[in-house]
Every structure is written in structure tokens, then in C-alpha cells.
UniProtKB/Swiss-Prot annotation:
Expressed by the skin dorsal glands. Disulfide bonds: none annotated. The modification Leucine amide is found at L30. Keywords: Amidation, Amphibian defense peptide, Secreted. Lacks antimicrobial activity. Does not inhibit the formation of NO by neuronal nitric oxide. It comes from Litoria rothii. It is found in: Secreted. This is Rothein 3.3. Belongs to the frog skin active peptide (FSAP) family. Rothein subfamily. GO terms for biological process: defense response. GO terms for cellular component: extracellular region.
Length: 30
């Protein structure tokens, strides 16, 4: 989650946010 959070913090691509959020959920579920 922290990795994707860092990406979101430095990226204005709002369309990627849902994708990164999904990756956060997958990683936290492992």
C-alpha cells in the first residue's frame, strides 16, 4: 500500500488511482 501511495503522491494521473488502489488491496491481502 505504501508503494502505491508513494506513486499516487507523485502522480496526477487520476485514472491510475483506482488501479493502484486495487493493487494495494491485493498486496494487503497476501
Amino acid at each position: 500500500a505504501s508503494a502505491a501511495g508513494a506513486v499516487r503522491a507523485g502522480d496526477d494521473e487520476t485514472l491510475l488511482n483506482p488501479v493502484l488502489n486495487s493493487l494495494d488491496n491485493l498486496v494487503s491481502g497476501l
